[in-house]
Each structure stands twice: as C-alpha cells, then as structure tokens.
Amino acid sequence: MRLAIIALAAAGAASLGVAAVAAKESPLGPPPPKGAGLPSGHCFRSHDIRNHTIADKQTLLMNVNGRDTYRVTVAGACLAGAIDSDPIITRNPPGSDIICRPIDMDLGVAKSGFETRCIVQSIAKMSPAEVAALPKKLKP
C-alpha cells in the first residue's frame, strides 16, 4: 500500500512537471502563419546559411551571411531530439537556389546518423530587436 501511494505521488509530480514545461512560453512568441514567406528584398540563398540553432521541436533559427536571422517553422515535431550540433541539410530545389517561400526550402536534419526530412511551414526574417531579445543559447 505504501509503495502504491509513493508511486502515485511520483506520477502526479511528474505530470505536473510536464505540464509546467508544456505551458512555458517560447521566447519567440507565436509562429508566423503557415505559408508565410519573405518579401523579395529579404530572400536569401541556401549557401549563405552560416549557423543555426534549434529553438524547439518545430523552430529552427538560422544566421544568414553573418547579418540576418531567420525563423523557420516546420511541420510536426521534425526537430524533436535534434541538437544544435546536428547538421542541417538543404537541397536546392530545381530552378533556383533563392529561398523566399516555404516551398523553396528543402530541409532536413541529420540526427544520430540518419536524415529526417522536414516540411517547412513558414519563413520569417527576425528584426534586430527580436534577435536582441533572444536568450544567448538561442542566438545562431
């Protein structure tokens, strides 16, 4: 009986901890709407990506040319289990290597020696104020 009470108490505490983590707001705020792309002056070439960080299971932050930071939102939990040191894999779609819309970005992440392909839902250029507000560990 005593073991059952201890097990129930531990399970309750664990579920409260999970709920607290799930309720924690992202420092990024809500993601851009699905299908959101970039205005023509903010497009970039895939070979200009210099660094990245994985903000959460659906958000990748990329440094482009050492000047700009872009927020890429992916479908599902494509980035779950990935860490910042896991390489991202981009392929140029046929016709152009310029990324302006989600469909322009063919993205994957190499986790534990296996590639996971991601469906890009939105791309947004972050403002200097948004980048400055990021915690240090999230800055690409």
List the model feature ranges, each with a label.
Residues 1-4:
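Positively charged n-region of N-terminal signal peptides that target proteins for export
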Residues 7-15:
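Bacterial N-terminal signal peptides
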Residues 8, 35-36, 41, 110, ...:
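Short, functionally important structural connectors and interaction interfaces within domains
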Residues 18-19:
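Cleavable N-terminal export/targeting peptides
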Residues 22-82, 137-140:
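N-terminal secretory signal peptides
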Residues 76-140:
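Helix-rich interaction surfaces within compact, conserved domain-sized segments
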